[in-house]
């Protein structure tokens, strides 16, 4: 990257499950045939594929993606059917209601995209209200003033401690992350009626590699005029979306100069490029977003062909809207959040703002909270962002629940070196939280972790029947959530990824008396 903040190097290593066959994968794993393994790679340095084929854990990723791709159409059909049946059941008020409505000839047929059509994720956790009371404007004022209060900045110690203590903001973030899975009408209704806030926009950005408008984010403020808080929430991994899951397991990297290497799939999800045209990443990232959504739409009409697609991506849509809101609301600060893939996009959004040297925008960043976020880049990206984002105060908090598999992918190994950065808030299955540099058990498929993970899954299933008796009706789990926990008996890391666990962790979490890493060590930047 040069002095103007322009990306001048786009080295890359693309791992493509489609480039080889199951036979090639078998020959590589069983017969140690490096030539067969190298078929799955495409790199800027032609010497790299053979080295990568020898050293890394990529066969696990490729095998998982190839198996998942076999079920892409059935999974999509199952997702549509599940959504329809759940909405049909609840909109007609259960089995007896269905029979009654048939008899009265007033059976209700759910319509996707309507304000009462809830996603499967929404039925896993039916809570829509913020914890206690909505974060009304004066509470948003407190969040901002506390963040700016110098008396709270004793080193970094108090600031870190405040991350667990500021439950209203954390709760708003996890609820916004969960709400991002819903359609626009549901999002608008919940923001306005349940949270008493101001809905701004809901965007569906184009992913040109997957040829689908499947990246979503919505934006809202605490009030329509003189807002203090702006929130951007990115949608996470769809439970029945095979392309989303393959993106999480993808190993592909593209180098962005001094900023290190970034996950290709996440850049594509943001609409910032296409792996079959590596130069597209350089072009889009070297182009700053316009100052408002109105300016973006005007410029997109006159933009050259190589930028039209980028302007239709969720990054440019969200960044332009944010800039316009920051101009309109002079005292506002903004928060970026997301669950799962949405968490990766949330922190990547912030990284791109930094790479583009959007200093005026980043000066008004309050926090980034991600929940169950996968790794988005290598060590160099973390090194590039750490001092810029977490100094002089920590603004990026990565929340991880227990055995959740997604924060542990893509795998880190001696070749790809995917690594997290920022401050990790880790919650165990009893909702004890502590600060750490990295969540324990970095490899979700290690045999040494299998026994404890399955024991925890049994405990979580049993806990789902008693939590409401201990903490109140708010914590009564739906039968859909319990069914998902039964799946967790076989795949613990998948069931642990449920937003139910993250909402409960934020609301019931308490700090571990003797954390594995002390706050003092964290304050010293360990």
From Swiss-Prot:
Entry EC no(s): 3.1.1.3
Any Pfam family hit: Lipase_3
Any GO CC annotation of this UniProt entry: membrane
Uppermost EC category: hydrolase
Any Gene Ontology biological process: lipid catabolic process
Membrane topology: Single-pass membrane protein
Swiss-Prot/TrEMBL keywords: Hydrolase, Lipid degradation, Lipid metabolism, Membrane, Transmembrane, Transmembrane helix
PANTHER family to which the protein is assigned, alphabetical: ALPHA/BETA-HYDROLASES SUPERFAMILY PROTEIN, TRIACYLGLYCEROL LIPASE OBL1
Name assigned to this protein: Triacylglycerol lipase OBL1
Lineage per the UniProt record: Eukaryota, Viridiplantae, Streptophyta, Embryophyta, Tracheophyta
